[in-house]
Amino acid sequence: MKFSIPPGVFDIIPTNTQEIWKSSYLWDFVERTIRKTVRDYGYQEIRTPLFERTELFQRSVGETSDIISKEMYTFEDKGGRSMSLRPEGTAPVMRSFIENQLHTIAPLQKLFYIAPMFRYERAQAGRYRQHHQFGAEAIGNSSPEQDAELIDLLYTLYKRLGLQNLSLNINSIGTISCRHTFRQALKDYLKPHLNNLSSDSQNRFETNPLRILDSKNAQDKQIVADAPSILDFLDEDSQIHFEQLKKLLKQLKIPYQVNPLLVRGLDYYNKTVFEVVVGELGAQNSIGGGGRYDGLLRELGGPDLPSIGFGTGIERIIQTMINQGIPLPSPCHPSLFLIPMGDEAKQLCFTLTHELRQQGIPTQMDFSGKKLGKVLQYADQIESTYVVVIGENELQTQEIELKELASGKKYKLTIDELAPTLKN
C-alpha cells in the first residue's frame, strides 16, 4: 500500500521547488524573526498540549461559533473523556495561566507561542486543516497602551519581514451590556431582510447576529452596509478607551481604518478588536488579528484579570512574502565539504569535520566512497561553498587545496590553517 498525506495538510521539507513556501528554511527564517521581535517587546514563550478537554473550547470560544459548531477535531479517549485538537491558541494559554497560577509570579504576564492549530475546514487558498500560528497574549493590564503595544508588536513583525500593502482595521465592540443593546437593534434592522440573507447568516440571526456583520457573502454585505453601528452603542468607558487607542496608534505612526463591521470570529472578545488584511491571499485576505477579552480568565475559573492577544498564520505570512516578491533568505549550505581518498584520510577527515563544527564552521564529509567526480557533483548540488580533497599526498605534506566552487578559485594552505582561514 502506498501512503499519501491526508487532505488539508502538507509537509514542510528542506527545499520545495514546486511550492517554495513549504521549504523549511523559510519557516526557520520567519520563526527566528518572530522570536527576536517578541523578545524585543518582553514576551516569553509558553507551550501547551496539542489537545485539551473539549469543554475548554466550548466555554471559551462559544457554543455558537463556527469553530465549535463546524470545525473541531474531537475524539473520545479511552477513559471516555471528550478531547479536541486545539483549534486556537488563546484558550489553552488561559487554562495554563490559571493552572500554573502565573498571576502569582508577576502582575503582568506577556506570553507568546508558535504552534500548530487544527480545524476541519474546506480547503482554499490560505486555509488548511492544520495551520501554524504565532500568537501573543498580555494578561493583567486593561490600558489602551497595552492594546497599542500589542498591535505595534504585530505590525513591527510584518514590517521586519518586509510585508507591504497592509491595512490595519480596528473597532470597539464595547462591553457585554453595550453588545446586548446593539444586538437587539441589529436584529430589528435585519429582520425585514431575513429571507434575503445567506443560509449561514440566517442560522446566526438568533444565536450570534453580530457575526452577520463580517459575512463574506456579497448579498449579506449589501444588507449590512446600512446596519446600525456598534460605535453608536458604546458606553463612556469603551468610548474613552477606543479614542485613546486611536491617538496612540497615530503617535506610533501606525496607519489604521476604523471598521464598525469588524467583530472577529470568537465570542470572548470585548472592547478593542483588530485585524490586518492583505490583498494576496485569495478568498482569505486576513493575515492576522485579535482583540481584548477581559472576562475570559474569570469565565474559565481563574482570577478576574484583563487580557488582550492576537494570532497570525505563518503559512499566510510566507505566502504573502512570496506573492509580494519580497527578497527571500537562501537555504543554509555547508561552508566546507571534505572528501577523503582512502581509509587513513577518512579517519583524519572524520576528526577534522568534528573539530571544525565545534568551532562553528558548517562542515560536511563524504561517507559514500564513490568516485571523486560523483562526490564533487554532490557537493555542488548541496551548494557547498568550499571543497577540500584529502588523499595520501595531503596526509604526507599536511598541505591542502581549498577550492571555492562558485568561482573555481584555489587556495594553498596547511590543514592547521583551514579553520582560521574559513573563519576569516
Swiss-Prot record:
Root EC class: ligase
Compartment(s) where it occurs, according to its Swiss-Prot or TrEMBL record: Cytoplasm
GO molecular function annotation: ATP binding; histidine-tRNA ligase activity
The entry's keywords: Aminoacyl-tRNA synthetase, ATP-binding, Cytoplasm, Ligase, Nucleotide-binding, Protein biosynthesis
SUPFAM superfamilies, per database record: Class II aaRS ABD-related (SSF52954), Class II aaRS and biotin synthetases (SSF55681)
Matching Pfam families: HGTP_anticodon, tRNA-synt_His
GO cellular component: cytoplasm
Enzyme Commission identifier(s): 6.1.1.21
GO BP, sorted A to Z: histidyl-tRNA aminoacylation
HAMAP family: His_tRNA_synth (MF_00127)
Record-linked PANTHER family: HISTIDINE--TRNA LIGASE, MITOCHONDRIAL-RELATED, HISTIDYL-TRNA SYNTHETASE
Protein name, UniProt field: Histidine--tRNA ligase
Encoding gene per record: hisS
